[in-house]
Amino acid sequence: MLTLNNISKSYKLGKEEVPILKHINLTVQAGEFLAIMGPSGSGKSTLMNIIGCLDRPTSGTYTLDQIDILKGKDGALAEIRNESIGFVFQTFHLLPRLTALQNVELPMIYNKVKKKERRQRAYEALEKVGLKDRVSYKPPKLSGGQKQRVAIARALVNQPRFILADEPTGALDTKSSEQILALFSELHREGKTIIMITHDPDVAKKADRTVFIRDGELVLDERGDISHA
C-alpha cells in the first residue's frame, strides 16, 4: 500500500548539509499495524512528517497505492493529507470553541460534504469511539482520554487509507492510555492500517510490527513482541 524507497532528508545549516534521514526503505501493507520507535533526535518525527505529506524528502520516492505522490504540487499533497491520512496527535489539536461533533466534522467541511451527511458521519464516528453522550461537549469539558477519542473519530471520519498517530498516549494517564490503545487494537482488527510513532515499548507491543530508527537510519524491523529489543 505504502512504500518509501531510498528516502533521505537533510537541512542546510550555513554552508553545511545536515542529514536527518538516510536512505530509508519502508513498506507498509494494507491492514498492518506498524510502530515506529526511536529516541529523541533519531529522525522519527521527520519520517512521520514525510509519511503524512507534511514535508518532502530531499531525495527518494514515496508511493501510496502505486501512485508517486511526491510528483504532485503542495496543493495535491494537501488533498492527499485530507482524503487519505487520518492524523492523531499527542496534544489532540482540537478547536476549543467547537463541540466534539463540530471538531469531527472539520475534515468533511474541507471535502465539501453536505451538512446533513457530515453531521451523520460525525455522530457515527463519535458513537464508534464511545462518545455518543459527549457530542455537544467542548474540549475544555472533556478529559484527556475523551479528547483523544474525539481526535480518533476525526481521523476516521473521511475513511482514510491509513491512520498516522504521533505519540497518541503521550499526554494521557495510565488508564486512559490503556483505553486508547485498546481502541487502536479494535480498529486494527477491523482492518484499519495504523502507523504509530512512539518511544514507549509497552505502546509498541500493541503493533504487529515495529521498526526502530536511530541517527536517521532504520536499524531494526521486527514482528511480534519487541520487549527484548
Curated annotation (Swiss-Prot):
EC number(s) reported in the record: 7.-.-.-
SUPFAM superfamilies xref list: P-loop containing nucleoside triphosphate hydrolases
GO MF: ATP binding; ATP hydrolysis activity; transmembrane transporter activity
Keywords, sorted A to Z: ATP-binding, Nucleotide-binding, Translocase, Transport
Binding of ATP, residues: 38-45
GO cellular component, one term: plasma membrane
EC class: translocase
Entry's Gene Ontology BP terms: transmembrane transport
Top-rank taxon: Bacteria
Gene3D superfamilies (alphabetical): P-loop containing nucleotide triphosphate hydrolases
Domain ABC transporter: 2-229
InterPro entries, per database record: AAA+_ATPase (IPR003593), ABC_transporter-like_ATP-bd (IPR003439), ABC_transporter-like_CS (IPR017871), ABC_transpr_LolD-like (IPR015854), MacB-like_ATP-bd (IPR017911), P-loop_NTPase (IPR027417)
Keyword Transmembrane helix: no
Family note: Belongs to the ABC transporter superfamily.
Protein name: Uncharacterized ABC transporter ATP-binding protein YvrO
Taxonomic source organism: Bacillus subtilis (strain 168)
